[in-house]
UniProtKB/Swiss-Prot annotation:
Cited InterPro entries: Ribosomal_uS8, Ribosomal_uS8_CS, Ribosomal_uS8_sf
UniProt KW keywords: Ribonucleoprotein, Ribosomal protein, RNA-binding, rRNA-binding
A molecular function (GO) term: rRNA binding
Species the sequence originates in: Laribacter hongkongensis (strain HLHK9)
Name of protein: Small ribosomal subunit protein uS8
Domain of life: Bacteria
Length: 131
């Protein structure tokens, strides 16, 4: 079976694993998924991540983060999807929960947070929001 939206699959796996308080979650790896995981780690939403497995089929393993028994990620949603891509300029990138959350943006300079994209003055595809 082919996967039509690997980013949505990644976010769903994280959401489902946190609902049952799993320590980690594994998924097929790609460069974009690793970049998103790096942003989540930099922002403190996950403990760590690692790419394991053989070269033909790498596996992304994400260590989930909890605080007082509750998941750190309260909400994680896909915004731009294959059927409806959402592109925003640097001035139009939304602030998630008035700055408490983060929007992950794919720009020409790589995958970054909404704050970094606004500071750099570049827009891009709005991949997902995390709060």
């Amino acid at each position: 079976m082919s996967m039509h939206d690997p980013i949505s699959d990644m976010l769903t796996r994280i959401r489902n694993a946190q609902r049952v308080t799993k320590a980690s979650v594994a998924m097929p790896s790609s460069k974009l998924k690793v970049a998103i995981a790096a942003v989540l780690k930099d922002e403190g939403y996950i403990e760590d991540f690692a790419v394991t497995g053989e070269e033909k089929k790498p596996v992304l393993d994400i260590q989930l983060k909890y605080y007082a028994g509750r998941p750190v990620i309260e909400r994680i949603e896909r915004v731009s999807r294959p059927g409806l891509r959402i592109y925003k300029g640097s001035n139009d990138i939304p602030r998630v929960m008035n700055g408490l959350g983060v929007a992950i943006v794919s720009t020409s300079k790589g995958v970054m947070t909404d704050r970094k994209a606004r500071a750099a003055g570049i827009g891009g595809e709005l991949l997902c929001i995390v709060a």
